[in-house]
Amino acid sequence: MFRLVSLNLNGIRSAANKGLLPWAEALSADCMGVQELKAQSADLTPALSTIAGMPGQFHHAEKKGYSGVGLYSRHEPSDVIIGLGANDPSGEFDPEGRYVEMRFDKPGRKLSIISCYFPSGSSSEERQEAKFRFLDIMAPHLARLKAEREFILIGDVNIAHKEADLKNWK
């Protein structure tokens, strides 16, 4: 069995102070996706760069204390893709640290695991428009990916389609 976990950390250092490291050790996951790192590369100590024996790969936001995603894996990926690159032709979202993909390709099987943090859109009309632009980029990107490989998308997609999916429905 392959154990896959996804966590919105709301800050990796804060999560570590609240018990992330022993929790991850006890969980024995094969792969762990994280969102909202809120840390730069220089902020990641060795204990945060590798968790529970799983080395991590990260897409940090340029803005300090903002966004960022990562993937930790017990298994060596055949490739790692940081950011959307050419799939984000305007370059709007890569500076926000929203996408990291690990590829685990073997003869006869292509598999990707993606950790992604979709924009929320709840803070302003401008951010809602940014969220729509992000969705307009992601939909064709995932369709192209699906045509060439299997993938698992994990993360914080910031989409709730029913009132029951929201803690404080307004």
Model-inferred region functions:
Residues 1-51, 56, 61-67:
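N-terminal, active-site-proximal structural segment of metallo-dependent hydrolase catalytic domains
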Residues 2-10, 110-120, 154:
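Active-site-proximal beta-strand elements of phosphoester/diester hydrolases
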Residues 12-16, 94, 130-137:
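Soluble or luminal CAZymes and related metallo-dependent hydrolases
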Residues 13, 41-43, 65-66, 121-124, ...:
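Short catalytic/ligand-binding loop motif for oxyanion handling, primarily in non-cytosolic enzymes
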Residues 21-25, 98-108, 137-149:
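Short amphipathic alpha-helices and their capping/turn segments at secondary-structure boundaries
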Residues 31, 52-55, 134-170:
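Metal-dependent phosphoesterases centered on the DNase I-like endonuclease/exonuclease/phosphatase
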Residues 38, 46-120:
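Structured beta-strand-rich core segments of catalytic domains in phosphoester-bond hydrolases
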Residues 84-90, 118-135, 168-170:
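Surface-exposed cleft-lining segments at the edges of enzyme active sites
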